[in-house]
């Protein structure tokens, strides 16, 4: 009996606090749907397709509106002009990342993806400096990608034209490219530890994109209950063990005057700052940063290419045009290089359209304001959660006629030349844009052109029967599972 009385009092206090918060905070925030106590607007938002719900709410409340995922307000930015103003023109004010209970447990506020403040600034600046010194964005990294693509093509030939799921092989290329930069070596595709490492990334992405993970973010108390988030934490622990094993190998052979890879550079930086108690360069930060680099450079790229292959199976006429351009510009025997992209406008347009159409990250993990912000006539307090709906730019019907249709013409002018678009925000925008954007662009071009140079893609069903609907259209657009045949040409 006492337990029920306690729960009743507890719930009453929650409702009172919620209503008080509504009166004192919400009146200055942008408009939005009226939230329910405790639940907020979560019952009004389809967690399986948040971007669709955002579109409907934006039509009613405008491009800047407030919704409650649980008991805390979240300001939603919808539409290219609003996104540009907040993320680019006023990027500093919207540059912090909001932490969920699950991600806070994993990142500990470290690394380059989920950190904020001085840790983020120093770690990101250092990481970019090291990556550039090791050839990121230059011919050096292009050579590494080309070398890894050779292993991919060999693995695809070994399928002998039989049906196969390309997921693992497509993930091997970006993962090994990152590995060569961080660990200074690649892994054989048959390496069981490497296979498990990639599998853990794939599982983590699926869990993060799940409705359960979104509910855990809204209601942290769920974090203490049984659920798939425990699988997420287990996978993270396994990955950290894998990374630590590589770090220890580097520590044993470290040459302070001759760094060979990212780990060496970081360990040397740690050594230089070992007497600085406030140094951001710690072993924990190194482990989390490496995990961030692998996460940013592996799953997004491989899933985009996989989704791209599915679309090329669905639209064989597009595939044929790419292969014609490959034959004309590159030929059958020379391996593709990044200089070729300037002479292949149709292929470039297809790659951009794949990313625009699939909208892999419709709504990135929320940011938060770094200070009190006056934005378009509204007051947004410091620390307020902010959602940037990238779908609203990528699927803007004024910039991209028939945005729900896959059409490479969205990125071609009337003369067939490649046409850039400021609305292309597949990698987000501003200070928190994807750190691996340049690498991802190179990998997508070199992998796709190499595959189509050497293979014909054969679907297992009629192209018109292929379903390209994502299986989890929530925070991530995960492609449906499928198989295809790679027929050597």
From Swiss-Prot:
It comes from the Eukaryota. A cytochrome P450 monooxygenase involved in muricholic acid (MCA) synthesis. Hydroxylates at the 6-beta position two major bile acids, chenodeoxycholic acid (CDCA) and ursodeoxycholic acid (UDCA) to form alpha-MCA and beta-MCA, respectively. May regulate NR1H4/farnesoid X receptor signaling, as taurine-conjugated MCAs are antagonists of NR1H4. Mechanistically, uses molecular oxygen inserting one oxygen atom into a substrate, and reducing the second into a water molecule, with two electrons provided by NADPH via cytochrome P450 reductase (CPR; NADPH-ferrihemoprotein reductase). GO terms for molecular function: heme binding; iron ion binding; monooxygenase activity; oxidoreductase activity, acting on paired donors, with incorporation or reduction of molecular oxygen, reduced flavin or flavoprotein as one donor, and incorporation of one atom of oxygen. Belongs to the cytochrome P450 family. It comes from Rattus norvegicus. Residues 1-27 form the signal peptide. GO terms for cellular component: cytoplasm; endoplasmic reticulum membrane; intracellular membrane-bounded organelle. The gene is Cyp2c70. The lineage of its organism: Eukaryota, Metazoa, Chordata, Craniata, Vertebrata. Heme binds at residue 434. One of its GO terms (biological process) is xenobiotic metabolic process. Keywords: Endoplasmic reticulum, Heme, Iron, Membrane, Metal-binding, Microsome, Monooxygenase, Oxidoreductase, Signal. This is Cytochrome P450 2C70. Its EC number is 1.14.14.-. It is a peripheral membrane protein. It is found in: Endoplasmic reticulum membrane; Microsome membrane. The keyword DNA-binding does not apply. It catalyses: chenodeoxycholate + reduced [NADPH--hemoprotein reductase] + O2 = alpha-muricholate + oxidized [NADPH--hemoprotein reductase] + H2O + H(+); ursodeoxycholate + reduced [NADPH--hemoprotein reductase] + O2 = beta-muricholate + oxidized [NADPH--hemoprotein reductase] + H2O + H(+). Its cofactor is heme.
